[in-house]
Structures are given as structure tokens and as C-alpha cells.
């Protein structure tokens, strides 16, 4: 069967949509990386716990510095808990439009909150690697995802929301990931290969 991988045929200094070329052997990892899109519109159908467990296991098997595993992960798939957290965030951010706070999770039925250990300087990198594993493994299982930064700002202003998530003392949210079944099919966006060079 054929697979798809990045083509180097186009000029390096031009932005372009990811190009694909047919190869003889199927490579599911490359296919997943090239096919994944950020999803911002979801069906109401929840992601079952068994599927989530597999996705999360892939996440914590990400590379990380000295195997410190300098992350904590909280998963919210209960609509009532999600509404509670949104309420805390809205109250703690009175200068923000409530609709913006309400919509910051893109109505994803499952939310993952990733916190880092600020005492370890490579912890943000570790959390990024964990998050990428989560999003790629989710896509391979038919689950869409979106990486979100705005909710982190709202969370950090809300002691009640932070307490509800139950992170250990000192850990700070750094990434939020929405997951669910896609209700849209986004087009690939251009990537700038001019930012990548071999040093001769």
C-alpha cells in the first residue's frame, strides 16, 4: 500500500502547503504527522475512557529530560466539572468578555490540562513533547485535538479553578488540549521550509 511523506521538491524559501509523494512502503507515523489538523469544532459525542487511557499512556511515554517526567496531567470529561471550572475562570477574569472565557475550550468534550514544574528549566520542553504525543496518538485513533494557550491565562488568575484541578504545589498549567470527534475537515496550512537549513 502507498503512504505519504513530505516532498522536498519545492523551493526552500517559499511558504507552501505540505506536499506529499507516494512511496512503496506504508509508514503510519509519517502519515499521521502529515495528516493531523487542529480541530476547533467538535461533535457532542464523548471520547470513551478506554481510548483516552491509551492516548494518555502514549503521552507519558514521550521523551523527557533525565526521565524526570516533570509534568502533571489532569483530564476533565465531565460536563458538570467543566462548567464549574469555566465559572471559576469567568469570575476570576472580570475584565474579559464572559463569552470569550466560555468559548476558550472550543466546546471540546474532553479537556487535558498539562502543568509543568518551574523548578526544572527543561520542564516546558518535556510538557510539549508529552502534548505532541497525545495529539498524534489521538489522531491515529480518529480523535481530533487542538492545543490551546488562552485557557492557561484564565486558569492562572483563578485559585478556585486551580484547586479544582488539583495540581501538586508548585506546578503551573502550561498547555491545554481539547479532544473530541471532529465536526470539521480543515485544509492544510502553508509551512515555511525556508526556516529549515542544513549547516554546511
Where on the chain are the PLM-derived regions?
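Bacterial N-terminal signal peptides
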Residues: 1-5
Amino acid at each position: 500500500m502507498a503512504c505519504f511523506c513530505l516532498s522536498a521538491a519545492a523551493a526552500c524559501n517559499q511558504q507552501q502547503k505540505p506536499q506529499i509523494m507516494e512511496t512503496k512502503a506504508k509508514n503510519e507515523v509519517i502519515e499521521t504527522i502529515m495528516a493531523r489538523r487542529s480541530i476547533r469544532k467538535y461533535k457532542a459525542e464523548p471520547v470513551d475512557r478506554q481510548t483516552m487511557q491509551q492516548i494518555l499512556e502514549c503521552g507519558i511515554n514521550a521523551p523527557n529530560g533525565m526521565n524526570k517526567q516533570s509534568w502533571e496531567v489532569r483530564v476533565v470529561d465531565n460536563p458538570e466539572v467543566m462548567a464549574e471550572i469555566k465559572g471559576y475562570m469567568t469570575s476570576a477574569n472580570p475584565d474579559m468578555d464572559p463569552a470569550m472565557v466560555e468559548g476558550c475550550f472550543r466546546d471540546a468534550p474532553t479537556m487535558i490540562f498539562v502543568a509543568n514544574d518551574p523548578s526544572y528549566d527543561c520542564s516546558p520542553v518535556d510538557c510539549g513533547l508529552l502534548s505532541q504525543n497525545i495529539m498524534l496518538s489521538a489522531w491515529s485513533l480518529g480523535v481530533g485535538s487542538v492545543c490551546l494557550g488562552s485557557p492557561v491565562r484564565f486558569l492562572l488568575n483563578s485559585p478556585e479553578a486551580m484547586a479544582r484541578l488539583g495540581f501538586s504545589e508548585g506546578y503551573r498549567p502550561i498547555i491545554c488540549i481539547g479532544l473530541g470527534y471532529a465536526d470539521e475537515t480543515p485544509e492544510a496550512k502553508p509551512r515555511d521550509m525556508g526556516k529549515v537549513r542544513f549547516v554546511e
